[in-house]
């Protein structure tokens, strides 16, 4: 997975995890899963409902939070400027 993909996925999933936001996860085969993001890594998301399911990211089509979330993100140029200022 590209680092740009991780720059988007990780903050998004982390906010969902930290704030215990209920989510609907749609798989590429059309199945809808619901629960809360318990944990995640490069390849999987642990989704907790009555049980914890390990869902492979390559099988996920869409992640839909039950409420709006603010995702803090920086552009690479901003990161470089901050590093140079330090």
UniProtKB/Swiss-Prot annotation:
GO process terms (BP): regulation of DNA-templated transcription; regulation of RNA stability; regulation of translation, ncRNA-mediated
This protein's record includes keyword Metal-binding: no
CDD domains linked: Hfq
Keyword Electron transport: no
Gene Ontology MF terms: RNA binding
GO cellular component, one term: cytosol
Gene3D superfamilies in UniProt: 2.30.30.100
Entries under InterPro entries matching the protein: Hfq, LSM_dom_sf, Sm
Pfam families documented for this protein: Hfq
Keyword annotations: RNA-binding, Stress response
Annotated spans, Disordered: 67-86
Sm domain boundaries: 10-69
HAMAP family: Hfq (MF_00436)
Subunit structure of this chain's protein: Homohexamer.
Protein family: Belongs to the Hfq family.
Function: RNA chaperone that binds small regulatory RNA (sRNAs) and mRNAs to facilitate mRNA translational regulation in response to envelope stress, environmental stress and changes in metabolite concentrations. Also binds with high specificity to tRNAs.
Protein name per UniProt: RNA-binding protein Hfq
């Amino acid at each position: 997975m590209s680092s740009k993909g991780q720059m988007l996925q990780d903050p998004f999933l982390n906010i969902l995890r930290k704030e215990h936001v209920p989510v609907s996860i749609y798989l590429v085969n059309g199945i809808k899963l619901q629960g809360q993001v318990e944990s995640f890594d490069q390849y999987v998301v642990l989704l907790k409902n009555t049980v914890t399911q390990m869902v492979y990211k390559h099988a996920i089509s869409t992640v839909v939070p039950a409420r709006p979330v603010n995702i803090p993100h920086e552009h690479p140029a901003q990161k470089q400027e901050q590093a140079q200022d330090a």
